[in-house]
Amino acid sequence: FFLKALQELGFEINISEEKKTVRIQGMNGRIPKKEATIQVGSAGTAARFLTAFLAMSDGTYQIESSEQMKKRPMKDLLLALEGLGASFAYLEEPYHFPMKVTGMGINTEKCSKIFLNIDQSSQFLSALLMVAPVCLGKLEIELTGHRNARSYVEMTQQMMMQFGHPGVRM
C-alpha cells in the first residue's frame, strides 16, 4: 500500500527485483500532486506515516482504508498534526479513516513545541520524526504517555541520520 500510495501522489519509483531495492525520487519535502486519493488498506505504518507526510504538505488529499484500519487509533497523531496547522475533515467517524487532509504547507512559522501521547502507538512519534525536517529544526516534541518504544524510535532516528537529519529535541 505504501509504494502504491506514493505513486498515486506522483512520485517516481523504481523497483529492482533483481537487486531487491526500491528507489524513490524525493522532492525536498514536496509532493508532486496537490490533490489525490490514496488507499492505506490495513497497513498501520503506511497510514500513520503518510498521514503525517500529507499534513505537512501544501495540498489536499483523501485517505481511504480497510474496515479494520478504520477502528485503529489515530487521534493523538491527528491532534499533534492539527497543532502544527494541518486540518482534517472526517468522512465517517471523527479521528478515524476515511478522511480528507489539508496540509499546513511548508511553513516553519507553525513549527513549534507540540505534545504527543504515545500510549497507543509509537508509530505516531516515528511519523512526526520523519516529517520533522520540514520544520528546519524548529520542532520540539514533548511526549506524554508511558509506552516503551525506544527501539523503534531509535531505529527511526538512525535512519534519518543516514539521510543527514540531526534529530528532533524531545
Residue ranges, per PLM feature:
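Structural preference for solvent-exposed beta-strand-turn elements
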Residues: 1-170
